[in-house]
Amino acid sequence: MQRHKVEIGSPDGSPGIKRSDSLDPIANTTILSVPQRPSSPRQFFERLYGHLETRSSENGEIDVGTHAHKPPPCDTPYHSDGGSVSSPDISISDERTSLAAYPAYDFYGHAKDYPQHPSQQHQQHHHHHHHPPQLVHQKLSYVSPPPAIAAGGAANPVLPHAFPAGFPSDPHFSAGFSAFLARRRRKEGRQRRQRTTFSTEQTLRLEVEFHRNEYISRSRRFELAETLRLTETQIKIWFQNRRAKDKRIEKAQIDQHYRNFVVANGFMSSIMGQAATTMPPGGVTGGVAVGVGLNYYAAAATPAALPKDNTQDANFIDIDDQFQRQQQQKQQQQQQQQRRRETTTPINIC
């Protein structure tokens, strides 16, 4: 195995670079000792994690390389044995060289095994000085996702490239969306429970039992199941649904009564406002007292002037009229009884 030793001296008299290269790419080690000024934290992290980043070119190819960002130029130019090739834009550090040997991992812990072009594999077995520094970036041979994903189907929804271009690349979003798709597939594959259809006879019998008692006992439930050819669970669920329906109907009726009361109160307030403007200064003559709730208002109007419809104020007026008529009838009856007592004379028995 032939080994080459290269000593590079800097023009300012600083220590040179001792480099030992071999033709074997596995045994090839690069040892550089270049005095550099302290780097910033951003440049430090670029050296550590620069090989994990991907960059898409304009033609749709993905460039994956050990140098995602250009490091600061080195003071000492790079010379090779094969020719005078110098590039001040390329600087190799120990951290970048050591980390480039490890494969890249995605956020799921899977190693990214990128296929390489045969020409690139052939280039890796040659020495570095046979190629210019522009071959640092490796272009992947495959650009688009697998055919199943390109056709619109998600062959593996866990991978980030399976999502459309509009979705964010957040790992938490990808994991949550994958779980959502899994739950949806399980739900679609599961057979839905058939809804029980009750006949007219069964419904009438159950309605009769519900009107007798809203909560059915276990013994009675067993008897109904035998009679109607149903299961006890079906009867139990029917009673639960019927009670819920009753509560909904009752709540709707209460809401309707409340709305009617609000409408009637607003209508009577408008009538009282009109009556206050037309009321004579001496007071109310010939008016009637109209009650709304517990408050009574004097209105300069007759009952015939108010609308006789299904509103609540009309019902109050009807109740007041009936009460007055009953009072008048009682007074007339009392007067008739007194007259009868006065006309009748006692019979003297001798």
Curated annotation (Swiss-Prot):
Its main location: nucleus. GO terms for cellular component: nucleus. Expressed in cells within, and posterior to, the morphogenetic furrow of the eye imaginal disk, expression is rapidly restricted to the R2, R3, R4, and R5 precursor cells. Disruption phenotype: R2 and R5 fail to be correctly determined and appear to be transformed into cells of the R3/4/1/6 subtype. Residues 191-250 bind DNA. One of its GO terms (biological process) is regulation of transcription by RNA polymerase II. Residues 1-23, 70-91, 111-137, 324-350 are annotated as: Disordered. Gene3D superfamilies: Homeodomain-like. Residues 123-132 have a biased composition (Basic residues). PROSITE patterns: HOMEOBOX_1 (PS00027), HOMEOBOX_2 (PS50071). It is found in: Nucleus. Keywords: Developmental protein, DNA-binding, Homeobox, Nucleus, Sensory transduction, Transcription, Transcription regulation, Vision. InterPro entries: HD, HD_metazoa, Homeobox_CS, Homeodomain-like_sf, HXA1/B1/D1. Residues 324-337 have a biased composition (Low complexity). Transmembrane segments: none annotated. SMART domains: HOX. GO terms for molecular function: DNA-binding transcription factor activity, RNA polymerase II-specific; RNA polymerase II cis-regulatory region sequence-specific DNA binding; RNA polymerase II transcription regulatory region sequence-specific DNA binding. Required to establish the unique cell identity of photoreceptors R2 and R5 and consequently for ommatidial assembly in the developing eye imaginal disk. Repression of expression in R8 photoreceptor by senseless (sens) is an essential mechanism of R8 cell fate determination. This is Homeobox protein rough. It comes from Drosophila melanogaster. The gene is ro.
